From Swiss-Prot:
Alphabetical UniProt keywords: Apoptosis, Cell adhesion, Cell membrane, Cell projection, Endoplasmic reticulum, Endosome, Golgi apparatus, Hydrolase, Membrane, Notch signaling pathway, Phosphoprotein, Protease, Synapse, Transmembrane, Transmembrane helix
GO molecular function, a single term: aspartic endopeptidase activity, intramembrane cleaving
Residue positions, PTM Phosphothreonine: T328
Region (Required for interaction with CTNND2) residue spans: 371-398
Name of the molecule in the record: Presenilin-1
InterPro entries according to UniProt: Pept_A22A_PS1, Peptidase_A22A, Preselin/SPP, Presenilin_C
Subcellular location: Endoplasmic reticulum; Endoplasmic reticulum membrane; Golgi apparatus membrane; Cytoplasmic granule
Residues carrying Phosphoserine: S50, S309, S330, S345, S370
Region described as Important for cleavage of target proteins: spans on this chain: 287-289, 376-380, 431-433
Length: 466
């Protein structure tokens, strides 16, 4: 599941006070008023004033904001697409490099407990049936675990979710990393004592737990998330049978589509629940390109929403006090009738209407919503990293060492991811990241492995040049 960076400007001063916002709004209104008044004097065609400025200026400001949003979408959209391509590429490169060099992950030493049926059968029909049963069991486990996660999050069982994620991270960062490091040392014939290996694994795991579940530099957190995704993908590549793996990739794409887009889909319910609570998802589940908040999960900065709500409450209280206490209205606070007459002679009559107040409030909320640049960015689920890498790794392991098929799958996944982000920019809602990329990857794999590669072999055998 992917999210798009908010198409709003990145302000350097994210802690501007409310008075500064109001003063900036008034200053912009005065500039607009002076510009329009000069045009009217030049054309001799005056416009009615409302709240000291032309009535149509608010619409022009909104149109100008829309144009700036489109420009910033083009500017920052491509930047974040590249920022998402880099980690996906790194994860797939780690997996492919391991598959090509470490034979441990291509040997068939067993299967997962979720895939109990073997594919070493006498007939193709039995193998197909066993692969379908294995895929059904695996997808059922994924669906049940996803629903369990949504239920725990909906009922605020945060400690249970944290414990679940911490145990998973411990297994990946300590046990699977130890197995991976040991196999790499065996492959390259590196001699190392167990004490040194234990120190390496201890430091690697502890730093990873701190960076993922607590605090740490962004690049360090991203590196650990990429590494644990690659380790999980390698486990799937080793222990999933070939036909079962391809079938799981096809079915998981359909499930991802249903889970994200259906009104009662588990992932959509998770997003909507987080949006209602203005909460971020757990960092062990999501890769972020910046220190960000899921934009679709919170339609604005939570702090800004609190400020806006406080302003609205203040305005409501002021209105109520004005209606209930007419005596205080006689207290002009220094703004006498002479001052108002002098102001009207310079700026025109000051008439506050519902439309102008709404326009000013909208401008203030837009400024507040675009304050925090650290709350904008792209997020991609770690499951997407894992299944992208499983597809490329399986292609590398089962395509007879053919680099053409591996590269074709790699390019297909990036093309699908780019199209997904393009659709994300159009619809501006959370979209599943697996269907397009996995579909392209499967089509490219089978087309290259069974059509392109035999054709190229025949050309090379007969020494034909095209």
């Amino acid at each position: 599941m992917t999210e798009l960076p908010a198409p709003l400007s990145y302000f350097q001063n994210a802690q501007m006070s409310e008075d500064n916002h109001l003063s900036n709004t008034v200053r912009s209104q005065n500039d607009s008023r002076e510009q329009h008044s000069s045009e009217r004097r030049r054309r001799g065609n005056p416009e009615p004033l409302s709240n000291g400025r032309p009535q149509g200026s608010s619409h022009q400001v909104v149109e100008q904001d829309d144009e700036e949003d489109e420009e910033l979408t083009l500017k920052y959209g491509a930047k974040h697409v590249i920022m998402l391509f880099v980690p996906v590429t790194l994860c797939m490169v780690v997996v492919v490099a391991t598959i090509k060099s470490v034979s441990f992950y291509t040997r068939k030493d067993g299967q997962l407990i979720y895939t109990p049926f073997t594919e070493d059968t006498e007939t193709v029909g039995q193998r197909a049936l066993h692969s379908i049963l294995n895929a059904a069991i695996m997808i059922s486990v994924i669906v049940v675990m996803t629903i369990l996660l949504v239920v725990l999050y909906k009922y605020r069982c945060y400690k249970v979710i944290h414990a679940w994620l911490i145990i998973s991270s411990l297994l990946l960062l300590f046990l699977f990393s130890f197995i991976y490091l040991g196999e790499v040392f065996k492959t390259y014939n590196v001699a190392m004592d167990y004490i040194t290996v234990a120190l390496l694994i201890w430091n690697f795991g502890v730093v990873g737990m701190i960076a993922i579940h607590w605090k740490g530099p962004l690049r360090l957190q991203q590196a650990y998330l990429i590494m644990i995704s690659a380790l999980m993908a390698l486990v799937f590549i080793k222990y999933l049978p070939e036909w079962t793996a391809w079938l799981i990739l096809a079915v998981i794409s359909v499930y991802d589509l249903v889970a994200v887009l259906c009104p009662k889909g588990p992932l959509r319910m998770l997003v909507e629940t987080a949006q209602e609570r203005n909460e971020t998802l757990f960092p062990a589940l999501i890769y972020s390109s910046t220190m960000v908040w899921l934009v679709n999960m919170a339609e604005g900065d939570p702090e800004a929403q609190r400020k806006v709500s406080k302003n609205s409450n203040y305005n409501a209280q002021s209105t109520e006090s004005e209606t209930q206490d007419p005596v205080t209205e006689s207290d002009d606070g220094g703004f006498s009738e002479e001052w108002e007459a002098q102001r009207d002679s310079r700026l025109g009559p000051h008439h506050s209407t519902t439309e102008t107040r709404a326009a000013v409030q909208e401008l203030s909320s837009n400024i507040l919503a675009s304050e925090d640049p650290e709350e904008r960015g792209v997020k991609l689920g770690l499951g997407d990293f894992i299944f992208y890498s499983v597809l490329v790794g399986k292609a590398s392991a089962t395509a007879s060492g053919d680099w053409n098929t591996t590269i074709a799958c790699f390019v297909a996944i990036l093309i699908g991811l780019c199209l997904t982000l393009l659709l994300l920019a159009i619809f501006k809602k959370a979209l599943p990241a697996l269907p397009i990329s996995i579909t392209f990857g499967l089509v490219f794999y089978f087309a290259t492995d069974y059509l392109v590669q035999p054709f190229m072999d025949q050309l090379a055998f007969h020494q034909f040049y095209i």
